[in-house]
Amino acid sequence: MGKKRIYELAKEINVSSKQIIAKAEEKGFPVKNHMSTLGENEERQLRAAFKPQAKTSHEQSAASAQPQRKVQQPRREKSQGTARTQTTAQKPAGKPANQTQRNNNNKNNGQTGNRQHEQQHSGTGRFGGSLNNNTNNSNGRRNSNNSNSRGGRNSRNNRNNRRRNNNNNNRYKKNQRIKDTNQHKGAPERKNKALPEVLVYTDGMNAQDLAKILHRSSAEIVKKLFMLGVMVNQNQSLDKDTIEILADDYGIQAQEKVEVDVTDIDKFFDAEMANKDFEAPRAPVVTIMGHVDHGKTTLLDHLRHSHITDGEAGGITQAIGAYQVHYNDKVITFLDTPGHAAFTEMRARGAEITDITVLVVAADDGVMPQTIEAIHHAKAAGTPIIVAVNKIDKPGANPNHVMEQLTEYELIPEDWGGDTIFVEISAKFGKNIDELLDMILLQSDVLELKANPKQNGVGSVIEARLDQGKGSVATLLVQQGTLHVGDPIVVGNTFGRVRTMVNERGRRIKDATPSTPVEITGLNDVPEAGDRFVVFDDEKTARAAGEERAKEALVKERRNTSHVTLDNLFDSLKEGEMKEVDVIIKADVQGSVEALAGSLKKIDVSGVRVNIIHSAVGAINESDVTLAEASDAIIIGFNVRPTPQARAQADSDKVDIRLHNVIYNAIDEIETAMKGLLEPTYEEEIIGEVEVKDIFHASKVGTIVGGMVTEGYVTSESDVRLIRDGVVIYEGKLGSLKRFKDDVKQVKMGYELGLTIENYNDVKVGDVIEAYVMKEVPVK
């Protein structure tokens, strides 16, 4: 607790501050005035010194209060005695009557005077305490009318004044006792409230805010700050140092409250994912990828014992599906993707939800373009690949040829000395499916996949749609924690409360553990595939976070992430953001692809290497742009052009495409960009033309051209080209540009002007002066 001041101690023990100061000086305490502070030992000694005195003063106050209550009792007795006195006082009334009979002229007046004297003496007996007969007789002998009437009025006035004064005194004393009692009872309550052990504050608090936390009045906080040398009012903001000094003066600790940005759900997601407490093994999440019609959906159909192929248009998967398969008392979660766009979009948003990739390759068709793309997608995501060679039941199946083809993409079978698992299957007849599941579980054991189910659920969106009957429907994959029905949730830029939760078989469930795909309802809007979701403790916080994220997204309009280009490549390398440059190569023939790839791999600048993530023959298509956008790569086209759709998508996603027809130019461009030597390209833009109307000669200036702007405009900083009969005679800069006698910066079409060409005078009437500027454009 803080040190107590003298005036505070004086109030508590009910003595004056001067007495405490005098006693403190006797004991040798260093005090100066009533604001001086006392230590605990000094306070204890002074309390002991004034303890008997405080008791005596209390007894005196109690004793002084008793006579005030006894004063009222004699009044009641005297009032009774007054009544008796009035009855006895009626007997001598006849004496004044006899006197008035002897004085016939003053008969009536004498009776009035005697009656008034009776009232006066009765009043005197009532308030004075006793009656005197001699006084009554002497007053009764007065025969003057004026004196008798005046004496009656005075007696009534005196009696009323005394009654009024007594009532006022009694009322004042009663109110004073009530006030003293209330002060005695209410004063210690506020002072006895304990201070908090720690003052949790935020920068910018005022005295009122601190008073509520410290259980003190605002005036006390302002006074204490004043004694500490800080002059503020109760509404003025305080900085961190002042608040900490105040807390130190009170003898408590100060701790600044850390404000958490609830809109940054990625921070909550990472924190939940990093929680290693209560970890337990979880099911692996497996993505099935491959070329169209190679049997991806048929394989998954056999795994989950349902037939979805017949219900889909043309046998092609129309939406992402997530299903769980139970095998050998273990669970495997499978994701079936419609092509690779959704997988890439999820990876582009940072949703690394896949643990293992199963690459399905038909034994009769071999490696196809989408197979190669699937390999590059999986490698870019950093997931291990298990190759399922399908359709081995067909007559033309050649699994060995598939293995030979995949060795070109660094997928070497274990039998051949590599580390890639190959399984020959027949999805149609279910051959070797169990062996494939065994290999998946074996790979998951190697990865040691674990998660904490005893926390709030977090995960990613697999797919989302708007249902007419249900509203927003989202398929979620729980990656950490447990998701319950009724949980307040934020999904991307949407929010809500989990109203219903359905598993892949259409059954309602109440909770979902890690690696479990579920379909939920209750969101206010439709999220996007790859968005993360986080469960909050209360719906109010979830709503605030979701609304703020939606507002930010609306303002920024889903601003595109700036990807690496050759123009900013050197800056990215210099800032240490990149250790390698990802490149996609597309060429007209395979020989050009191999030559360009080999030359680019030999470039070595400051320890940064070129990483070719995809190379193929053919035009640059949308799939190439999607892969480049997800991998932050540069596309190099050799003797090929992008399709219109790919060009539009590249412009939208800010993907850099470089086109060349000379292989060494492509190599030099990449190398110079990595070294920071790539110079900008300039483009000429003609802004105006001037027709020469007249020529003037000045000895100090030279040839002055008088003309008119026939097209565009001319600026004083323009470069000019003198054209005579369609032939360029001279190129240079303007020396000066005037209109009448004033120097101007610009002259527009239809206006006359005067100009000079720097270091050139051979200008003739009828010549055309062309004005142009050089603009910097990025190299494409």
UniProtKB/Swiss-Prot annotation:
Task: Report biased composition (Polar residues) as residue ranges.
Answer: 59-71, 80-90
Q: Which cysteines are joined by disulfide bonds?
A: none
Bias (Basic residues): 159-176
Region called G5, residue ranges: 426-428
Q: Where is the composition biased (Low complexity)?
A: 98-114, 132-158
Under Gene3D superfamilies, the record lists: 1.10.10.2480, P-loop containing nucleotide triphosphate hydrolases, Translation factors, Translation initiation factor IF- 2, domain 3
Residues of the region (Disordered) are 24-194
Main localisation, per the record? cytoplasm
Q: Where does GTP bind?
A: 290-297, 336-340, 390-393
Q: Which domain of life is it from?
A: Bacteria
Q: Which UniProt keywords apply?
A: Cytoplasm, GTP-binding, Initiation factor, Nucleotide-binding, Protein biosynthesis
Q: Name one Pfam family in it.
A: IF2_N
> Where is the region G4?
390-393
The subcellular location is: Cytoplasm
User: Locate the tr-type G domain: which residues?
Assistant: 281-450
* UniProt KW 4Fe-4S keyword: no
UniProt lists the family membership as follows:
Belongs to the TRAFAC class translation factor GTPase superfamily. Classic translation factor GTPase family. IF-2 subfamily.
Protein name (Swiss-Prot/TrEMBL): Translation initiation factor IF-2
Q: Which organism is it from?
A: Levilactobacillus brevis (strain ATCC 367 / BCRC 12310 / CIP 105137 / JCM 1170 / LMG 11437 / NCIMB 947 / NCTC 947) (Lactobacillus brevis)
